[in-house]
């Protein structure tokens, strides 16, 4: 039976072959021959290679132009034409041999040259030496580090705090410690560069919302909620974070924290709050934007700030619940792999905290001086003030751009240079232009401290007005 079936199939194949069009048979034959050739032929023939002559080699070598190892940098780049500071950059600063009133350094509370802070650092230097020469997990944890963490936690009224040896690395390490690939981060377009680097290291999905625009943020949260409903299994393992600054470095504006907290609970997200500018500035006791708004600090999942502004030291810290902070001790890259904070700087930060707690009126003084110069700088022809009246760091931008960023930078630098000639030290806000996610416009940054007198604030404002009129009109 099987033999008869096989014969019948063979007969059908022969009949189909006879009935097939001639062009079809020819095409199949060519393809079969081509496959056989590919199987048995060599990939190349040695005799087909032709060596270059000596003349051809010399011509190729002469024509070859190597790619530069680094990008071309103009000779007038700020990094190649820096100002040299002599002495501490406190109330008065000596720049290129000229003494100026300092409106450039983030020494908000005037503690950089404070005798008590220097004495504490000197005593620590004599006791511990200069540095630690090791990360916290490898004999780099000193008792003064634990004391500082305890003091910061108590000052901020949180369960625990952790310190880093470099301010920039604090938020840049904290974000990727929690947010991983597949997680979603909603971040303000005006976020500072340290936040951007933390987001990049996290490899999470980044969704940018318009600066301080809660309607735009809620739109993105709603869109994500709809996506989560389409794939509930994925949504269960996807974490959602909202990353904002208390006072924005790039704009000098304050975040609308009460609205952010409402959105957090409505859409089940976590809030990371970067307070490098608002810590030691906002609030009755300098605890930052949470105290300023009267928000329960437990509503914020993680708070970070550097100690290089108000505390006039080095490094940064994160604070929050114990289980949140403990995770960073195992996953915070800047904590695990960098040498710990030099003990003398930790001692200086502790003494700075002591001064802040003993003199809570200092924060009201700072706010009043911020309002004074903010008001005095209004109405400058050609310049506009960008930032809150209560922010100690704000920006002066051109009212109308020339259409060229390079030309805008040159005009603003001319204003900075002429102000320095009149003993007012200012600086432009600098950015890594090719790496910024949302590059801010060129601006002059003005920094206010408690050490500046009312007369000096008025003098700075009048100087900036006169110079701006001379340069821009």
Curated annotation (Swiss-Prot):
Q: The organism's lineage? A: Eukaryota, Metazoa, Chordata, Craniata, Vertebrata
User: Does the record's keyword annotation contain Membrane?
Assistant: yes
- Cellular component terms, GO, for this chain's entry? endoplasmic reticulum membrane; serine palmitoyltransferase complex
Task: Quote the subcellular location field of this record.
Answer: Endoplasmic reticulum membrane
User: What interactions and quaternary structure are annotated?
Assistant: Component of the serine palmitoyltransferase (SPT) complex, which is also composed of SPTLC2 or SPTLC3 and SPTSSA or SPTSSB. The heterodimer with SPTLC2 or SPTLC3 forms the catalytic core of the enzyme, while SPTSSA or SPTSSB subunits determine substrate specificity. SPT also interacts with ORMDL proteins, especially ORMDL3, which negatively regulate SPT activity in the presence of ceramides. Forms dimers of heterodimers with SPTLC2. Interacts with RTN4.
Domain of life of the source: Eukaryota
The family assignment reads: Belongs to the class-II pyridoxal-phosphate-dependent aminotransferase family.
Q: How is its activity regulated?
A: SPT complex catalytic activity is negatively regulated by ORMDL proteins, including ORMDL3, in the presence of ceramides. This mechanism allows to maintain ceramide levels at sufficient concentrations for the production of complex sphingolipids, but which prevents the accumulation of ceramides to levels that trigger apoptosis.
Q: What is this protein called?
A: Serine palmitoyltransferase 1
Q: What's a Pfam family in this record?
A: Aminotran_1_2
Question: Transmembrane stretches, by residue range?
Answer: 16-36
GO MF annotations, alphabetized: pyridoxal phosphate binding; serine C-palmitoyltransferase activity
| Protein function | Component of the serine palmitoyltransferase multisubunit enzyme (SPT) that catalyzes the initial and rate-limiting step in sphingolipid biosynthesis by condensing L-serine and activated acyl-CoA (most commonly palmitoyl-CoA) to form long-chain bases. The SPT complex is also composed of SPTLC2 or SPTLC3 and SPTSSA or SPTSSB. Within this complex, the heterodimer with SPTLC2 or SPTLC3 forms the catalytic core. The composition of the serine palmitoyltransferase (SPT) complex determines the substrate preference.
Q: What is its EC number?
A: 2.3.1.50
Coiled-coil ranges per UniProt: none
Cofactor(s) this protein cannot do without: pyridoxal 5'-phosphate
User: Where on the chain is Phosphotyrosine found, per UniProt?
Assistant: 164
Q: What does the UniProt PTM comment say about this protein?
A: Phosphorylation at Tyr-164 inhibits activity and promotes cell survival.
Q: Which InterPro entries match?
A: Aminotransferase_I/II_large, AON_synthase_class-II, PyrdxlP-dep_Trfase, PyrdxlP-dep_Trfase_major, PyrdxlP-dep_Trfase_small
What organism does this protein naturally occur in? Answer: Pongo abelii
Q: What is one process in the GO biological process aspect for this record?
A: regulation of fat cell apoptotic process
- Catalyses which reaction(s): L-serine + hexadecanoyl-CoA + H(+) = 3-oxosphinganine + CO2 + CoA; octadecanoyl-CoA + L-serine + H(+) = 3-oxoeicosasphinganine + CO2 + CoA; tetradecanoyl-CoA + L-serine + H(+) = 3-oxohexadecasphinganine + CO2 + CoA; dodecanoyl-CoA + L-serine + H(+) = 3-oxotetradecasphinganine + CO2 + CoA
What does the UniProt entry state concerning the protein's domains? The transmembrane domain is involved in the interaction with ORMDL3.
First-level EC class: transferase
Which pathway does the record list?
A: Lipid metabolism; sphingolipid metabolism
The record's principal subcellular location, in a coarse class, is endoplasmic reticulum
Region feature (Interaction with SPTLC2): 1-66
